[in-house]
A protein has these predicted regions:
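Short polybasic amphipathic segments
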Residues: 25-29, 160, 165-174
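Conserved catalytic and cofactor-binding micro-motifs
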Residues: 154-159
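A conserved segment at the C-terminal end of the G1
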Residues: 3-25
Length: 175
């Protein structure tokens, strides 16, 4: 999640936005560390969202923070779930991957109707979450022939795939 957060923040900053972001190692505004530590909870999100200089927020969100205090925001434009894996089990009432999927789904369920949920097309739990969303859905996969990606694009959906050493965006038959 931290790598994804940093990558998104870097891309947005290079498009001339003033970016604030939170990760498991700190709170940053324009790449300047404002606070060190695990800042993936709602208090850190509020820190970024209340800063008048921040034009674009990228907020890494951990399951523990969601369980304890929620997200720190009500709605967002884009929500990303990179995966749902067993290494995140064992906190509070999260005993299996279905429990974890329910917690992580809170992020993409907060996406505005005209916003985007970006989900792992190779993760069965992410695909299940996608079916219940009312926002736009984009999938990603390292496998250009991933069945979920093929089906999603055949239905006119958008996906990002790794193809011939490049990240390729697909929509329908278009690349």
């Amino acid at each position: 999640k931290t790598t994804t957060t940093r990558l998104i923040a870097h891309i947005v900053k290079n498009n001339n936005y003033k970016v604030g972001f939170t990760t498991s190692d700190g709170i940053y505004i324009q790449n300047h560390m404002m606070e060190k530590g695990d800042t993936t909870g709602p208090i850190s999100a509020e820190y970024i969202l209340k800063d008048p200089n921040v034009e674009f927020a990228v907020l890494e969100t951990a399951r523990g923070g969601i369980l304890r205090s929620g997200l720190g925001f009500k709605v967002c434009d884009i929500g990303v779930i990179t995966n749902i894996q067993e290494d995140h089990l064992g906190l509070s009432d999260i005993h299996d991957l279905n429990d974890l999927a329910r917690v992580k789904s809170v992020v993409v369920e907060s996406v505005k109707k005209d916003g985007w949920a970006v989900l792992n097309g190779e993760d069965v739990h992410c695909l299940e979450i996608a079916r219940s969303l009312s926002c736009n859905v984009a999938l990603f996969s390292l496998d250009e022939n991933c069945p979920a990606i093929v089906e999603h694009c055949a239905e006119g959906g958008i996906a990002a795939i790794y193809e011939n050493g490049y990240i390729t965006i697909k929509k329908g038959d278009w690349k």
